[in-house]
């Protein structure tokens, strides 16, 4: 699937209300492990492909400044509507920026987001971005994310399962892929691994893994 087809796929998901991937409260893996990033209150956290995730609300409640990027305008509008917030909205190149309080979300294709638009980030939280993308786009996404933020501490949630069992998304992402795409910039620590109760979509045994990415020191 190319980038355009992938964008159409997710836009249509939101238009049809097929949002079973949305969680109505903060993910417990986030609340258990965010401290592993060792970020102070006021730190700037990037949440790529954020949807209308309640994780952003929770992070803001912990004192962080949260920036998301989401393809679907529907998701972004619903996010702020559900919080009874009226965001400031402005066009920034091919994207639209919605902001209210310490949360802002860029609506549009993440590959159109630039470091200048994003600004400096102190950390990344990726629960549903990497695993939402087919393999070719995952590689492009990983490279783009590094170009946006540079190597900063990251909390990443992945799924690991037999990809032949399910078509995806969500897609299986194993440690070998992480090392191939991120190994030049990060050291990895597996913080937690747990079996998906009942199997993924009730069909396939799977493990959900939480990784901490720690930036490697610059080579001399």
UniProtKB/Swiss-Prot annotation:
Entry keyword Zinc: no
Keyword annotations: Cytoplasm, Methyltransferase, S-adenosyl-L-methionine, Transferase
SUPFAM superfamilies: S-adenosyl-L-methionine-dependent methyltransferases (SSF53335)
Molecular function terms from GO: thiopurine S-methyltransferase activity
Compartments where located: Cytoplasm
Catalytically driven reaction(s): S-adenosyl-L-methionine + a thiopurine = S-adenosyl-L-homocysteine + a thiopurine S-methylether
Top-level taxon of origin: Bacteria
Gene Ontology CC annotations of this record: cytoplasm
GO biological process: methylation; response to metal ion
Main localization of the protein described in the UniProt heading: cytoplasm
Annotated EC: 2.1.1.67
Listed transmembrane segments: none
Residues noted as binding S-adenosyl-L-methionine in the record, renumbered to the chain: 14, 49, 70, 127
Family note: Belongs to the class I-like SAM-binding methyltransferase superfamily. TPMT family.
Protein name per its UniProtKB record: Thiopurine S-methyltransferase
Record organism: Gluconobacter oxydans (strain 621H) (Gluconobacter suboxydans)
């Amino acid at each position: 699937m190319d980038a355009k087809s992938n964008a159409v796929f997710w836009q249509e998901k939101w238009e049809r209300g097929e949002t079973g991937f949305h969680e109505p409260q903060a993910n417990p893996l986030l609340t258990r492990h965010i401290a592993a990033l060792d970020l102070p209150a006021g730190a700037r956290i990037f949440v790529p492909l954020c949807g209308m995730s309640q994780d952003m609300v929770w992070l803001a409640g912990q004192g962080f400044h949260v920036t998301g990027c989401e393809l679907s305008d529907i998701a972004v509008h619903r996010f702020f509507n559900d919080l009874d917030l009226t965001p400031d909205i402005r066009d920034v190149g091919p994207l639209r920026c919605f902001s209210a309080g310490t949360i802002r979300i860029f609506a549009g294709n993440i590959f159109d987001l630039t470091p200048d638009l994003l600004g400096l980030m102190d950390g990344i939280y990726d629960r549903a971005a990497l695993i939402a993308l087919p393999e070719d786009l995952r590689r492009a996404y990983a490279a783009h994310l590094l170009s946006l933020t540079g190597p900063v501490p990251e909390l990443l949630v992945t799924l690991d399962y037999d990809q032949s069992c399910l078509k995806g998304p969500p897609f299986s992402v194993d440690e070998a892929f992480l090392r191939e795409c991120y190994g030049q910039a990060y050291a990895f620590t597996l913080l937690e691994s747990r079996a998906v109760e009942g199997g993924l979509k009730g069909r396939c045994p799977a493990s959900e893994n939480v990784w901490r990415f720690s930036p490697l020191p610059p080579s001399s």
